[in-house]
Amino acid sequence: MGKAAKKKYSGISTGKEVPSEQHMNTVFKFNTDLGQHILKNPLVAQGIVDKAQIKPSDIVLEVGPGTGNLTVRILEQARKVVAVEFDPRMAAELTKRVHGTPAEKKLEIMLGDFMKTELPYFDICISNTPYQISSPLVFKLINQPRPPRVSILMFQREFAMRLLARPGDSLYCRLSANVQMWANVTHVMKVGRNNFRPPPQVESSVVRIEIKTPRPPVDFNEWDGLLRIVFVRKNRTISAGFKSTAVLEIMEKNYKAYLATTNDAMVDDAKGSLAEQVKQKIETVLAETGLSDKRAGKCDQTDFLKLLYAFHQVGLHFS
């Protein structure tokens, strides 16, 4: 007996549309300012859902369901789907699409801005992401009290490549270092612009994000605060980033707050200007870690953790 053919989820458009999409141009004028680019290729839609490896007991969060081309496929596999939709017209279309079907009872639609919505518990997140909320969405997922087991997310190609970039890559940036601290990110597939209606101006990619378990024992705001400083100019030396007046003022303010919680406040005040002390502490940390002349764009997670720990040892904080 011959081998069964493998499913292929290429980003090449088949030219065939999901049936319920065929009348959409006469019903809607899509708002591209809201990132409304509806995925119309059924093979790509099915590929995205399959990569989530949904269990029958799973609750799936979908961000920006649109007219439901992903939603109806997720509903076939999940216990429940919570769909967060900003556009009331899209929510109404999705409601009509499942009305009178067994899937209707499994679908909950939350109408509103995803970034302002308090989310219920969910196991998996799937999203054809409105590109303007790509970064906020990723960090909201990462910082959930109980983050999803896995997220399968469609992004603008360049944004996806930034998530995946490694030290030394041209696209390696604060986003790369930050997300990779908390999650493992892998590339799933490229998706060409002709797979959408209306076609976006850029190509897309789907990525898989799995939150690390257990969560690294690092304060998110401290980690983020350090990266914001060193990646202001990723190709300048790290020491240059700490010479900025604005950065020194923030570091001094945080140091004062730290001293207020310890018994060392009077001692440090007696040593002279706090601003001067902060400068000296920064210089000492950078010299002792050997990172003074390194560039953030070449540094890895170990380098940044080493730097953060050394700053904390001398009472300097970033949040």
UniProtKB/Swiss-Prot annotation:
One BP annotation, GO: rRNA methylation
Catalytic activity entry: adenosine(1779)/adenosine(1780) in 18S rRNA + 4 S-adenosyl-L-methionine = N(6)-dimethyladenosine(1779)/N(6)-dimethyladenosine(1780) in 18S rRNA + 4 S-adenosyl-L-homocysteine + 4 H(+)
UniProt keyword annotations, A-Z: Methyltransferase, RNA-binding, rRNA processing, S-adenosyl-L-methionine, Transferase
Gene Ontology terms: cellular component: preribosome, small subunit precursor
CDD domains noted in UniProt: AdoMet_MTases
Root EC class: transferase
E.C. no: 2.1.1.183
GO molecular function ontology, one term from the record: rRNA (adenine-N6,N6-)-dimethyltransferase activity
Residues given in the record as S-adenosyl-L-methionine binding sites: 37, 39, 64, 85, 113, 128
InterPro entries per the UniProt record, alphabetical: KsgA/Erm (IPR001737), rRNA_Ade_Mease_Trfase_CS (IPR020596), rRNA_Ade_methylase_Trfase_N (IPR020598), rRNA_adenine_dimethylase (IPR011530), SAM-dependent_MTases_sf (IPR029063)
Superkingdom in the source lineage: Eukaryota
Protein function: Specifically dimethylates two adjacent adenosines in the loop of a conserved hairpin near the 3'-end of 18S rRNA in the 40S particle.
Protein family: Belongs to the class I-like SAM-binding methyltransferase superfamily. rRNA adenine N(6)-methyltransferase family.
Protein name: Dimethyladenosine transferase
Protein source organism: Eremothecium gossypii (strain ATCC 10895 / CBS 109.51 / FGSC 9923 / NRRL Y-1056) (Yeast)
Gene for this chain: DIM1
